[in-house]
A protein has these predicted regions:
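NAD(P)H dinucleotide-binding glycine-rich loop of Rossmann-like/cofactor-binding domains
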Residues: 86, 109-186
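Adenosine-nucleotide cofactor-binding segment
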Residues: 215-277
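C-terminal capping/lid region of NAD(P)-dependent oxidoreductase domains
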Residues: 264, 334-353
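Glycine-rich beta-strand-centered segment in the early N-terminal region that forms part
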Residues: 28-43, 55-115
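Glycine-rich NAD(P) Rossmann-fold beta1-alpha1 loop
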Residues: 169, 201-208, 212
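Glycine-rich phosphate-binding loop and adjacent beta-alpha segment
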Residues: 274-339
Length: 353
């Protein structure tokens, strides 16, 4: 019996979903409701890549060796420290006759579910990857389940650019939804105050898209918070935020002060897009009572967020960005095409890698 969520691929421990499993069966033979992808490139999530790079002191050979070891041992790419993975692009090799995904052999696709639940085998030893960038050129195969999500790659964008955007496409979609709800609520209540939005890590991939999405959804004032002057200058030049503030997101008072100074008030919506731990308290402190904090970082601690909000007597709603919102891929790609500032930041990041 083949499960639509991939239970039949779980090797150990029995009875858990693929994401929670220690090891998956990555046999290339597919069931009638599965799809096999010939993989051409992985995108490791930022928190996972940072942890690996720091662990090995930037030694690319050691990073590459550990990624290979994780995949061969676990049958998937899931960093055992961060618990996170990433996503991939490739070409459909075979689609089972009962697969509901609508994919056909030859389609070039981006997988929009995490590598942490995707059976994966690497066949080239990652020979073309130097271990120094989040994007990993490779050869191998991956298995999609009936409940997986994939998008056909757009013909007008370079695959590497599409991969970078689709890796974080859940962030702008959820930001857009939350900001639009706040704007609509104030309109219904006759509240003339503009909705203010702070994006922590505003110059990064998810951050830049979230700033663009917030503005499009009706935010009255936005601030992007970045840790270093180079990112401040890049985000200012991109023109995606009404203000750009320099602050360490791990410094709660410093972050809160930077946000409230830039906005004139605490943020109604704070979006956390940084890939380092310890940013929860600052995000809560920077958010107005009745506001919302959206955590998109894989480095977020539930305990730190929940207990921190309680300890600050902060009446805020906290959301975990789960990476999926209906229409998320189309929205992110449309923002990339429509916003030169977003595209410029993405292309500069890819060039630096």
């Amino acid at each position: 019996v083949t499960s639509p969520v991939g239970l039949h691929r779980v090797v150990e421990p029995a009875g858990v979903l693929p994401q929670a499993a220690w090891r998956l069966d990555a046999d290339p033979r597919i069931a009638a409701n599965e799809v096999r992808i010939r993989v051409e490139r992985l995108n490791l999530d930022a928190a996972s890549f940072r942890q690996l790079a720091e662990k090995h002191g930037g030694d690319g050979e050691k990073v590459r060796a550990e990624v290979l070891e994780i995949i061969s041992t676990r049958g998937k790419m899931q960093n055992p420290v961060t618990g996170s993975g990433g996503m991939l692009i490739g070409t459909v090799e075979e689609a089972g006759r009962r697969s509901p995904l609508g994919l056909r052999a030859g389609d070039r696709v981006a997988m929009l579910v995490s590598l942490t639940l995707t059976p994966l085998t690497i066949t080239d030893g990652l020979a073309r990857w130097d271990g120094r960038s989040e994007q990993v050129p490779c050869d191998g195969y991956a298995i999609l389940f009936a409940r997986s999500i994939a998008a056909v790659l757009p013909a007008d964008l370079h695959p590497e650019l599409s991969l970078a955007v689709l890796d974080v496409c859940g962030a702008p979609a959820l930001t857009s939804r939350v900001v639009a709800e706040q704007v609509a609520r104030r309109a219904r209540e006759g509240d003339p105050r503009p909705v203010s939005v702070a994006v922590i890590g505003g110059a990064g991939k998810s951050g830049s898209l979230s700033l663009a999405a917030a503005r499009r959804a009706g935010a009255g004032r936005t601030v992007g918070v970045v840790p270093v002057a180079a990112e401040r200058d890049a985000l200012t030049a991109a023109g995606l935020a009404d203000a750009v503030a320099l602050a360490d997101a791990r410094d709660p008072v410093g972050l809160s002060t930077a946000v409230t100074t830039a906005l004139g008030v605490p943020a109604d919506v704070t979006v956390v897009c940084v890939d380092v731990p310890g940013c929860e308290h600052g995000a809560v402190l920077a958010t107005a009572d009745g506001g919302t904090v959206i955590f998109f970082s894989m480095a977020t601690s539930f305990a730190a967020a929940a207990l921190g909000a309680e300890g600050l007597a902060a009446d805020v709603t906290m959301l975990v960005g789960n990476g999926y919102v209906p229409g998320h891929a189309a929205l992110a790609l449309e923002l990339l095409r429509a916003e030169p500032g977003v595209r410029g930041l993405f292309e500069a990041r890819l060039a630096a890698d």
